[in-house]
Amino acid sequence: MRLSRLLIGASLGVALSSTVFTAALADVKFGSLYPISGSLALLGEESARGLELAVDEVNAAGGIKGEKVVLERGDAVDNNQATGEARRLISLVGVKAIFGTYSSARVIAASQVSELAGIPYFEMGAVADEVTGRGLQYLFRTNPTAENMAKDSVDMLIKGIAPGLGKDPKDMKIGIIYEDSSYGTSVAGHQEDNAKAAGLTVVLKSGYPSNTVDMSSLVLELREKGADVVMQTSYQNDSVLFLQQANEAGYKPLAIIGGGGGYSMQPTADAVGHDLIDGVFDADYTQYAVNTSATPGLTEFVEAYKAKYGSQPRSGHSLTNYVGAKAIFQALNAGEGFEPDQIVSAVKALDIPDGQTAAGYGVKFGKNNQNERATMMGMQWQDGKLVTVYPENAAIAKMRFKK
């Protein structure tokens, strides 16, 4: 009898350990690679939150193909660390794919590692041309691009801002300023091309390091050139610096059009003051003051964000990453497994029509694995809030002008 009990106990122990082992195998690991410290940490962390919320949602629904998604985090504080963290996540942690990364420079560096290793990399926030322009096999981008941002900036000027000011856009002088990384350089180049193609006059195109502490000479140059429209592609610190120093110098262009980054952040408005930023335009990812009939699921996303993080979303970066991750998870759930070629096949078959995501745009990968349905929107700061004013089907407010 004692022997039987021992055998039963041993068998039960083996069964339990087998169950635990099987459960451990039922986790699928993905890398979450964003700058969560350093100068890009604020928007890096905001972007990562979108991925985290998508993971929470898919796990609550039973995971992907019955497996729980586990995020393994890496900090892409600079390009070298982004590369090192990609190696660690792939070689030591054994992630099946990497999601990230917000910064164009960081993803360009890190994705070289994943490409050589044959591990899929899903970029959900960086806009530079070079991200997908290298023709990598395992890199996919779900979000809109620098070209989208530039085109929307110029279109908004021609179709909305100039008429609202009672001006012929061809009579207006445009100054283009930008932080000089891959992000700013790409957007500014497309802005210049789009403006010139439309017959507009660009009087200045000038880059600067994003960590600059003085933009007074650039403000002076814009003023001397007579720029009455300024397009700035920038992070938070340089957005704040330009707005403050332009104000101090008494330089008041007819319109300022931001290119996402710092111009989409509530902390930027709070830092410079709501009166100063009032009327400033912005071309960027879908934000939250938008016609929700064009963005199904956005309200639920905001509620989930507030429940998890205890505040309103700080910018549309979290939403864009959430939408991208959800789309990839949907594809993987319909796919055959988590081997690299199975993942690639699954996401290439993805076909989400426009108007069916919380960002408004659809998802279908085309040339160079870029989401060919991704688009941006036009916003304006009004009464301390960033509200959507363009295009018409997504707008909740009319453009305002200080004539």
UniProtKB/Swiss-Prot annotation:
SUPFAM superfamilies: Periplasmic binding protein-like I. It comes from the Bacteria. One of its GO terms (biological process) is amino acid transport. It holds the Pfam family Peripla_BP_6. Keywords: Amino-acid transport, Signal, Transport. InterPro entries: BCAA_transport (IPR051010), Leu-bd (IPR028081), Leu_Ile_Val-bd (IPR000709), Peripla_BP_I (IPR028082). Disulfide bonds: none annotated. Residues 1-26 form the signal peptide. CDD domains: PBP1_ABC_ligand_binding-like. Component of an amino-acid transport system. Belongs to the leucine-binding protein family. This is Leu/Ile/Val-binding protein homolog 8. It comes from Brucella abortus (strain 2308).
